[in-house]
Each structure stands twice: as structure tokens, then as C-alpha cells.
Regions:
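An amphipathic alpha-helical interaction segment
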Residues: 132-182
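Alpha-helical residues within the helix-turn-helix
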Residues: 207, 255-256, 267, 271
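Short hydrophobic/aromatic patch on the recognition helix
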Residues: 216, 264-265, 269
Length: 281
């Protein structure tokens, strides 16, 4: 039987203090905001696990509404889920802080290959699923995070730690779906997300994916995807991440997202999320 978890706020200080750690297995991000904000139609590009360490987070769409406060619970979010997100500061005015892990498709595939016989199809996360953060689950989560943070932990060890966290979630009824074979739109998403600062064109992306520009556009249309819309979506979400997890200036963030004109970047950001870049900072 699991024990309720007491106050965890003091435990959420990672050794290196790094804000963002991309990994082949999973990635760790630590958003921090001194102003609350509301973002519409925010997209989670990968299977995600969220915990709020200070302040509050409300996630909602047509399916449901979920609220996290401090470190009392976790929220599992399915890949490609779109939700409206509201982040608020703590009652005492302390900054909103959170941590979230995104799990790579290769890791989830490995998990299902090893443990798929233990999983019930009805148990998979379809949109969002919330769970109390008990002591045992927190131990698994912290162990995984320390592995991401430590340069001395090999990728193999990190994989085992991440699988251990997925098992701990599975024991509590949380299972992410097994990734399907990626279509062209998914492969393009992965390509663009790796280097959103590059001056991408459909022709250049097609060469990287070994298809002609015409074939790329035709097959994307078959999947209901526009190249320019997807590129903008990836860049805007990358901008949102950088605004919340780094101290980079707005012009630097614009450049990191492939925009040489700050005014065009600012216009795109406001159009996509409904508020200005300055509203976050």
C-alpha cells in the first residue's frame, strides 16, 4: 500500500540547476514564470508527464479539465494532445514552477515490447490522466530525473531508469499508448523539431526525407497537414519553451526559432497563443 507524500517542494532542486536537458530517451524541462498566463490549443508533441512544484496549472479541452497544485499529483498527457493551459502563481506571489518529462517514441516502444503482455488496452492514456504523487512513485521519478541530470549516467542506465518510471506509472494505472510506425508528417515533425532555427523550405525538407517537394506536399495533404502550418506550430511551441525555461532575450529566442525579423516573430507568437511574448516575461 502506498503512503501519502508529504511536502515535496524542497526535493525539487536538481543538482546541476540546468533548465533543459534533451535526451534520446526522454527530456526534462523546468518552466518558471513570474506572471501567470493562458494559452489556447497548446500541443504536446510527445507523451508527457507533468508535475507542478509551485503555483497551479489548469489543463482543459472538450474531453475534460485537470488541475495541478504544487507537488501533490502528476498529470500524464498523451502524444499530440491539444489543450487550453492556464498557469497561475502561488498565493504568496511566488513564481510558477513545474517540471515535465517527455518520453521518446523509442522508449515507449521498448516498454511495450518488454511489458506489453502485462498491459490492458483500456488502461492507456487517451488525453490526460491525473494521479497522486505518492512516495514510491516520487522515488522512481526522482531517480529518473537524477539520471538525466548526471553526466556519469550512461544512456543504457538512463533507459532503465525511465523504464522503471513507466513501470511505476503502469502499476498505478497509467500507460502511454504504443507508438505506431511514423507517417511522413510525423517524420517531418521530428526533422523540423530537431532544428527549428534552420531556414526550412519544403524542398529542403523533402531532400532530407528522400522525397521530392511535390511528393512531400501531396503526401502531407493526404494526412491533412500543411508544411508551412506545421513549421510555424513547431517554431511557436519551441519559442514558448525557451521563454519559460531560459533567460535568453526575445531577439535571441526569435533567432533560435528561425525568425530574423523580431516583429514577424512577435506577430506570429501573438496570433498563435493569444498574448504577446512580453506577457510571459
Amino acid at each position: 500500500m502506498t503512503k501519502p507524500l508529504p511536502d515535496l517542494r524542497a526535493q525539487w532542486r536538481l543538482p546541476s540547476g540546468a533548465l533543459l536537458q534533451p535526451q534520446d530517451v526522454c527530456s526534462l524541462a523546468r518552466p518558471q514564470l513570474t506572471r501567470g498566463h493562458y494559452a489556447r490549443d497548446f500541443r504536446f508533441f510527445e507523451a508527457t508527464l507533468l508535475v507542478v512544484t509551485c503555483g497551479a496549472l489548469v489543463v482543459e479541452n472538450a474531453v475534460g479539465r485537470w488541475m495541478l497544485e504544487d507537488a501533490g499529483s502528476l498529470l500524464a498527457v498523451a502524444k499530440n494532445t491539444q489543450v487550453n493551459v492556464r498557469k497561475t502563481l502561488a498565493d504568496d506571489g511566488a513564481p510558477y514552477t513545474a517540471q515535465f518529462l517527455t518520453f521518446a517514441p523509442a522508449l515507449l516502444t521498448e516498454f511495450h515490447q518488454r511489458y506489453g503482455h502485462m498491459l490492458a488496452p483500456a488502461s492507456t492514456v487517451e488525453v490526460c490522466q491525473q494521479i497522486s504523487l505518492d512516495e514510491g512513485l516520487n522515488d522512481s521519478l526522482q531517480f529518473c530525473i537524477r539520471g538525466i541530470e548526471s553526466p556519469d549516467v550512461s544512456e543504457l542506465q538512463h533507459t532503465h531508469r525511465a523504464l522503471g518510471l513507466l513501470l511505476a506509472l503502469q502499476e498505478r494505472g497509467i500507460v502511454y499508448s504504443r507508438p505506431s510506425a511514423p507517417g511522413l508528417a510525423e517524420r517531418l515533425t521530428q526533422l523540423l523539431a530537431k532544428s527549428p532555427e534552420q531556414p526550412w523550405t519544403a524542398a529542403l525538407a523533402g531532400r532530407e526525407l528522400a522525397v521530392s517537394e511535390a511528393t512531400l506536399r501531396r503526401r502531407l495533404a493526404d494526412e491533412g497537414v500543411s508544411f508551412s502550418a506545421l513549421l510555424t506550430e513547431i517554431r511557436m511551441h519551441h519559442a514558448m519553451m525557451l521563454l519559460q525555461t531560459t533567460h535568453l532575450g526575445v531577439s535571441q529566442i526569435a533567432d533560435a526559432c528561425g525568425y530574423r525579423a523580431l516583429s514577424r516573430f512577435s506577430m506570429r507568437f501573438r496570433s498563435r497563443f493569444g498574448f504577446s511574448v512580453q506577457d510571459i516575461r
